[in-house]
Curated annotation (Swiss-Prot):
Keywords tagged on the record: Cell cycle, Cell division, Cell shape, Cell wall biogenesis/degradation, Cytoplasm, Peptidoglycan synthesis, Pyruvate, Transferase
Superkingdom field: Bacteria
Gene symbol of the encoding locus: murA
Protein name as annotated: UDP-N-acetylglucosamine 1-carboxyvinyltransferase
Taxonomic lineage: Bacteria, Pseudomonadati, Pseudomonadota, Gammaproteobacteria, Chromatiales
Localization terms from the record: Cytoplasm
Function recorded in the entry: Cell wall formation. Adds enolpyruvyl to UDP-N-acetylglucosamine.
Organism of origin: Thioalkalivibrio sulfidiphilus (strain HL-EbGR7)
Keyword Transferase among record annotations: yes
Reaction(s) this enzyme catalyzes, per UniProt: phosphoenolpyruvate + UDP-N-acetyl-alpha-D-glucosamine = UDP-N-acetyl-3-O-(1-carboxyvinyl)-alpha-D-glucosamine + phosphate
E.C. number(s) listed in UniProt: 2.5.1.7
Residues the record lists as binding UDP-N-acetyl-alpha-D-glucosamine: R93, D306, V328
Modified residues (2-(S-cysteinyl)pyruvic acid O-phosphothioketal): C117
Amino acid sequence: MDKLIIRGGRPLNGDVRISGAKNAVLPILASTLLADSPMTIGNVPHLQDVTTTMELLGRMGASLTVDERMHIEVDPTTTHDFVAPYELVKTMRASILVLGPMLARFGQAEVSMPGGCAIGSRPVNLHVDGLAAMGADISIDSGYIRARADRLKGARIVMDIVSVTGTENLMMAAALARGTTVIENAAREPEVVDLANCINTMGGQISGAGTDTIVIDGVETLHGCHYDVLPDRIETGTFLVAGAITGGKVRLRNTAPATLDAVLAKLEEAGAQMNIGEDWIELDMVGRRPRSVGLRTAPYPAFPTDMQAQFMALNSVAEGTAAIVETVFENRFMHALELQRMGADIRVEGNTALVRGVPKLTGAPVMATDLRASASLILAGLVAEGETLVDRIYHIDRGYECIEEKLSQLGASIRRVPG
């Protein structure tokens, strides 16, 4: 099992290109099942979750090719097996995203109950109840969600809680349904908007994405197209924190600043100087120690839960004390224990972590517990005195493309070693 070895204490400096968004490319790959002809997806990040999704589509019979630029062509017309098996789904919760499009396009689907990051309950009932409201015959049996429908019918669906994958699954299913579907209390994330834009490019009729009410007028068929995935706002935020925590100056290219308002506001509150263009962000923290920032995670457009761990690392070496409140997922403070091993002063009570900044962290062996937790440990390692060894980095490969190469490009001392 690979590990990362980091020698801290080097301010980062330089520019780096941001990859396509993991949380956008996975539903967009699932949406290719809706098309009646081949699709090409561009700006695809080279990630383990992308590989898993491609393997899942291939297992179902779709034909896939990848070129040297990581453009993925998917021909869904050869799909013949409508099962998403446990051995693939258990590694990635996003596998449930094939349920809606598979049912809408082929009238049947069997998807194993999902796995992925160990960060709490993410119930599938929102997906199941929404599809049932659209006329699907659904059962959960032997760990599988089994669904059938001749053709789904438009429905008014009110989501009990805001769910990104729930919104995406129902939006894809509704794209080929008969009539109009209205999703209320819908997720507003930029990745939901990107999926809607992709489906509309395929000939769909979706309006309201980015608001809490999405209207989908079902169409008879959707065609293949070329679509470029939007830049990854979480990778962007992570590299901005890397610049801030090390007292560096970084410029990020091929990003989407408009998707990052809450994160950029917190970085400015921490004392970072920011320059922002249409598709680039420059952060300057040279010669300054960050100030502690309190934050509360919530669905978009509020502060993203996927940036909570990175800001905990930043607060660990900041001036002052601040509270971090996690409202989206339970059990998402596992990185706090590992940061404490490096000397961080963190007290966790329920869904709140109180972080008192210390002058320095010390390198130590630490273990990644989930995707964003692993990013926080790398960030802590970049600023710690001495050597930090991060174990179980397969988590990081699920969501960050070539992270050690990009950080090295900015001047970090970081290398991957085999386990």
